Amino acid sequence: MFRKQNLKWLGVLATIIMTFVQLGGALVTKTGSEDGCGSSWPLCNGALLPENLPIQTIIELSHRAVSAISLIVVLWLVITAWKNIGYIKEIKPLSIISVGFLLVQALVGAAAVIWQQNPYVLALHFGISLISFSSVFLMTLIIFSIDKKYEADILFIHKPLRILTWLMAIIVYLTIYTGALVRHTKSSLAYGAWPIPFDDIVPHNAHDWVQFSHRGMAFITFIWIMITFIHAIKNYSDNRTVRYGYTASFILVILQVITGALSVITNVNLIIALFHALFITYLFGMIAYFILLMLRTTRSLK
């Protein structure tokens, strides 16, 4: 027998596990554990469970295990949602995207282990995983909105905010790519002091340019989200969905900037780096939700 409450718990579980997949990937990169299992995949150093287990191997194995569990739980969520609430227009496309990108994410990760891809390709891995996470996150939000306690179904987003939000999505995604590139090119401590080394502003090598590009994109992201937030609060003050959503996004980008700065100041403290990955994960999830609302608005115009 289908119960909405069970589906809600399943959605929350899937979202939490997908969050740990994101954090696990960041942990693997930050600790240099990419080669913890050698060039073996899905085995680890040629065995299901190798005898020698240094910390890098444990981290890589744990990430693979959580990724495998996430696939099972997401499939469970997708099948249950498709069967019971598939009449909701977004459920089936989101189901396909969540599973599809989860598989692509796994294949890119496997290719990185087996063939040692260059950092510019590896940087795509985090962005792909964020799309999968966001699909699961959106499904969970839709499941919770079934009881009609929210105003999202009757929300109409006008063109100015739609344009600002679409541009925000593009800018944030580019910033995410440059951030992943910083990790994969080992450029976290390049380009000197934060926000810029005033005594030596011009980047000198590829690592400096990667870090410089990410800081520049992060600055643009912060300014653009602030502009979008001000517009949303000013013009949609009577709508809780917009007010809370864009406020949450602005808070998340502030936290993202703070943890980014602290990462440089503390020489990439691991806990701060993981919070940096966590905040951008949920910021992207919020932007994905705004896109969902905008698509509903566009559909209502036809």
From Swiss-Prot:
Source organism per UniProt: Staphylococcus epidermidis (strain ATCC 12228 / FDA PCI 1200)
Known cofactor(s): heme b
Domain notes: The N-half (TM1-TM4) and C-half (TM5-TM8) domains are connected by an intracellular loop. Each domain is formed from four-helix bundles and they align in a pseudo twofold symmetry manner. The N-half domain is the substrate-heme O binding domain and the C-half domain is the cofactor heme B binding domain.
InterPro entries in the cross-refs: COX15/CtaA_fam, COX15/CtaA_HemeA_synthase, HemeA_Synthase_type1
Record-given protein name: Heme A synthase
Keyword match Ligase: no
Amino-acid positions noted as binding heme b in the UniProt annotation, renumbered to this chain: H214, H276
Transmembrane segments: 9-29, 68-88, 94-114, 126-146, 162-182, 216-236, 245-265, 271-291
Binding positions (heme o): H63, H125
Top-level EC class: oxidoreductase
Pathway per the UniProt entry: Porphyrin-containing compound metabolism; heme A biosynthesis; heme A from heme O: step 1/1
Entry keyword annotation includes Plastid: no
Description of how the protein assembles with itself and partners: Interacts with CtaB.
